[in-house]
């Protein structure tokens, strides 16, 4: 079986990312999940699992006093032992009245570098992890993106609030 995404065909046993933004009372929320189309193979299943685990590794670093470099380093350090890479062309971001606000939250970085996280900040952490190289191609629709080497990639995202009691995930799913 297959499904259509825009004008592109989505083939069974592949994976697809669903990135959703919702506005409520003038404020934005952003979340993404990558899911299999039908059943998936072990390699894709591992990619999905590692990407979600990398998201939570980054979220653990989202505390007052840490930096965006701490988050990015946690994400990249988590995926590298699996032979995976992270996209550098797309990053997480602050969010609020606008969907994309400062600061940018890369999925790579140096601990202690970049903007410092403060209590009350609302950010989106969104690892985009590739099984191969991080080079990408934008599809003809101008929106969809695939890896240049044709290997799978996965994307997970949560909107979180930085609090003195640790990160609070606003987009947690059941």
Label every model-predicted segment:
Residues 1-6, 11:
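Single conserved hydrophobic/aromatic residue that forms the stacking wall/gate
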Residues 2, 69, 88, 153-154:
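Residues that recognize and position ribonucleotide moieties
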Residues 12-39, 109-174:
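Charged, cofactor-coupling segments
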Residues 23-29, 40-116, 122-134:
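Conserved, well-structured core segments that form or line functional sites
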């Amino acid at each position: 079986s297959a499904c259509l995404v825009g004008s592109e065909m989505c083939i069974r046993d592949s994976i697809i990312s669903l990135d959703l933004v919702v506005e409520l009372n003038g404020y934005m929320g952003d979340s993404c999940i990558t899911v299999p189309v039908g059943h998936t193979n072990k390699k894709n299943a591992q990619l999905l699992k590692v990407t979600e685990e990398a998201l939570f590794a980054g979220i653990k670093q989202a505390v007052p006093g840490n930096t965006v470099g701490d988050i990015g380093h946690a994400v990249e350090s988590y995926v590298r032992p699996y032979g995976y890479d992270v996209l550098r062309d797309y990053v997480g971001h602050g969010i609020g009245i606008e969907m994309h606000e400062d600061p940018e939250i890369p999925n790579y970085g140096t601990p202690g570098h970049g903007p410092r996280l403060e209590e009350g900040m609302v950010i989106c952490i969104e690892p985009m992890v590739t099984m191969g190289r991080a080079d990408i191609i934008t599809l003809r629709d101008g929106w969809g993106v695939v890896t240049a080497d044709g290997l799978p990639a996965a994307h997970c995202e949560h909107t979180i609030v930085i609090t003195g009691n640790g990160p609070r995930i606003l987009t947690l799913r059941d």
